């Protein structure tokens, strides 16, 4: 059904296919053990993009694992934990739909296990030790990583690497080789949240006039 619905867009074959490592810690919730913190790094966008001027306009850092950008989200989870093999824009939507069904069934099972008499808040010491704490959880758009240090009940350091941040450096290569009119389809497929905050600008190669400058719509 999902493939039939997307077929109406008449997307070119191979749109959005990108060959990068996957980032997925769990099929549904989150698993810190699956996050390779020792090989995690961030670089400034000026150092990542071929044109430093483009990097200066970016609003996020570029997170990397083993020095490479990654793919995170429903398709990455479905491939890593469920054997899903298709790639590209259509595959992103199909994987998202299949994952929603899986999570619906999981939610029903979890609701049946709820103990309404159990404590609603975990017992922990909020004074902190000054050591780095890392939390990893899977959101609808991908892996969410939060890092913090707390000492004497005060936050000393906090950083969030959200799915959009992981997805940004991967969506660029996923659009290469296709007409600019399909750029919005790639953005929507990889990161529906980002599509509401993205401009598509088309510049004439000869006279550098701006042919298009529109917001991407969800």
Describe the residue ranges of each PLM region.
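Short beta-strand elements
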Residues: 144-162
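Active-site bordering "gate/hinge" segments
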Residues: 1-141, 151, 164-218
